[in-house]
């Protein structure tokens, strides 16, 4: 039986309470780790002292003054977290008691409330094969609850996925460095790998990107249940397959593993800070 929106709202309320003690747990821990050593802004240039990091040397000033100088940075007091949430058709997949959409909402809630604990701003970008909705970063519990309500009730215009679109949008609207969590199955229906690589490379030079993969176990392999009709949630394409055939099941599993490997390679190539694979289990 699928959960109702009231069920999810009840869980969100429980999550809000739970996150008060999650600072060293799974998602809150990842949040703190992602921000550790981040959010540094330029403060001043001063002469080099023994023990200073040579990577901070300002070579232009050093050349002009003929004395080693370094750039000094200070930690910014106000940090920003962005959530890039995949709202394409594939998020409505679910073979157990919950949809992928519901799990995404829970993860987003934990991350957002963790940011609130640190008095940080939280913003959100909903995307399919386009940017569906942009919620500018703000502070406060009421703002986070608004984001979660939007996640629960939002109806996208498109069912497809184009990951490069929200990443480009992030680069354009967020000039200040932030940590960004991308919540998606990372199955790009356009197959435009070069566009995604380019977008991630540019965004990664300005922001800290964290990939969180959300999937259902039944997406990885087919059960042996005879002849069934499969439908692509994003393209709407339907096909009949004989799941009693070992060859068919093996081909399906191999295809998923291949695509999963390509996703991991893309994230690694673009130096995504953390690529978490989240199986479809209860938090």
Locate each region found by the language model.
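Helix-loop elements that line ligand-binding/catalytic pockets
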Residues: 177, 192-196, 200-233
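Conserved small/polar residues in nucleotide/adenosyl-binding loops
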Residues: 281-282
